[in-house]
């Protein structure tokens, strides 16, 4: 049986509309295989080549000064596209992130690059609206509903929010499978941090209830991302 690779993804931006000159400033993406968080993730801050509006700064706390020495999007594009290749993207309010990512890709003016498609995404906002009509659907609201600890989320952050969304997505789809074993092997690639892990062999077709030890390892992994982001 083939593995199901999903990427939980989030971005932070300078504003709401790329057509008004707004750009992506942070990308966070976390790998999940057969509903198991593998520990592998992609994270990068990006120099937007423009100022940071105060309204955006109040949301994520990322300043223009902080981003001055960060890479431009074109320098990290290949690594990002390689990381998400052949995977379903899990995004909360997918049209927003896809719109911004495709705008950044269009600025590269590289004909060989294909734009991202909404048909290859799962929108957790749409899922939540379908499952809980009339409820609140923000990430914070869903964390509260599923008892996901978001106490450290004072400001938005792409990797932090992707980690929280991973927990929410697993809850929305009925629970996690098996476990993983962390192996710390950080590699710095164009200001990206990729951590490798060893996934234990599992029975792909069986959903199992996690043990206390597995839940603790899972919590430690999420906490590690929240601290590093």
UniProtKB/Swiss-Prot annotation:
Cofactor(s) in the UniProt record: Mg(2+); Mn(2+)
GO BP annotations, alphabetical order: DNA replication proofreading
Sample GO molecular function, one term: DNA binding
Gene Ontology CC annotation, any one: cytosol
Keyword terms, alphabetized: DNA replication, DNA-directed DNA polymerase, Exonuclease, Hydrolase, Magnesium, Manganese, Metal-binding, Nuclease, Nucleotidyltransferase, Transferase
EC number: 2.7.7.7
UniProt-annotated catalytic positions: 156
Presence of keyword Nucleus: no
Positions with a binding annotation for a divalent metal cation 1: 10, 12, 161
Cofactor note: Binds 2 divalent metal cations. Magnesium or manganese.
Binding locations of substrate: 10, 12, 55, 60, 161
Function: DNA polymerase III is a complex, multichain enzyme responsible for most of the replicative synthesis in bacteria. The epsilon subunit contain the editing function and is a proofreading 3'-5' exonuclease.
Subunit structure: DNA polymerase III contains a core (composed of alpha, epsilon and theta chains) that associates with a tau subunit. This core dimerizes to form the POLIII' complex. PolIII' associates with the gamma complex (composed of gamma, delta, delta', psi and chi chains) and with the beta chain to form the complete DNA polymerase III complex.
Protein name: DNA polymerase III subunit epsilon
């Amino acid at each position: 049986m083939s593995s199901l690779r999903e990427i939980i993804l989030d971005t932070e931006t300078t504003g709401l509309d790329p057509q008004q000159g707004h750009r992506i400033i942070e990308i966070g993406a976390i790998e999940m295989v057969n509903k198991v968080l593998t520990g592998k993730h992609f994270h990068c801050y990006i120099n937007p080549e423009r100022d940071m509006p105060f309204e955006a700064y109040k949301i994520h706390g990322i300043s223009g000064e902080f981003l001055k020495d960060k890479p431009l999007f074109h320098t990290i594009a290949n690594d990002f596209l390689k990381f998400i290749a052949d995977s379903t993207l899990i995004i909360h309010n997918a049209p927003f992130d896809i719109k911004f990512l495709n705008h950044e890709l269009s600025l590269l003016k590289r004909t060989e690059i294909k734009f991202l498609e909404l048909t290859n995404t799962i929108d957790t906002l749409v899922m939540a609206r379908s499952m809980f009509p009339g409820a609140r659907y923000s990430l914070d609201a869903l964390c509260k509903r599923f008892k996901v600890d978001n106490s450290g989320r004072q400001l938005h952050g792409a990797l932090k929010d992707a980690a929280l969304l991973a927990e929410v997505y697993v809850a929305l789809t009925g629970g996690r499978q098996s476990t993983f074993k962390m192996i710390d092997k950080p590699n710095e690639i164009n200001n990206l941090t990729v951590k490798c892990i060893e996934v234990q062999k599992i029975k792909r077709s069986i959903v199992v209830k996690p043990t206390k030890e597995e839940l603790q390892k899972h919590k430690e992994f999420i906490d590690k991302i929240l601290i590093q982001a």
